Amino acid sequence: MIKLTQILTEVPSVDAKVCLTMVQRTKSRLRIVLEDGQDAGLLLPRGHILHHGSLLSTDDGFVVEVVAAKEQVSTARSDNPTLFAKGCYHLGNRHVPLQVEAGWCRYQHDYVLDEMLIGLGLQVTVENEAFQPEAGAYGGTTGGHSHGDAYDDSLEKASHEHAHGHPHKHEH
């Protein structure tokens, strides 16, 4: 198995690619399959979120480029800047990872959030697109709280310790 242990900023060439969802790009320990079918494992420093185009490397210089997978997302649109800002405010108030662009925002599909935004007057469509949420108000990579990832031989299990003061649940 290929063990990807480093995050790089630039390389002369890429040896392979891997397509990962947003949730997978938040993991520092994860078993993955490269686009060419090779088994690999992420053994990365904690606290980093991978993005489309991130470059990973083994200790011996084998380089893998991350591709953001298309996944089910909701995209909310409005030509009204005030209405759009209100929609983004309500999503942020619920700690929803959010990709914000001019006139539209995107989040992992949730019909309850869709209905809330439609009720506010935004147009919402469910799509299969790459999802690149904002890093957060403080530029942090973990969305305001931390998740401890414990490595085991299968690279598939993760502990779930929290370091924050507000209750919510996560599904894994």
Swiss-Prot record:
Keywords: Chaperone, Cytoplasm, Nickel. Pfam families: UreE_C, UreE_N. Belongs to the UreE family. It is found in: Cytoplasm. Involved in urease metallocenter assembly. Binds nickel. Probably functions as a nickel donor during metallocenter assembly. CDD domains: UreE (cd00571). One of its GO terms (biological process) is urea metabolic process. It comes from the Bacteria. InterPro entries: UreE, UreE_C_dom, UreE_N, UreE_N_sf. GO terms for cellular component: cytoplasm. This is Urease accessory protein UreE. One of its GO terms (molecular function) is unfolded protein binding. Transmembrane segments: none annotated.
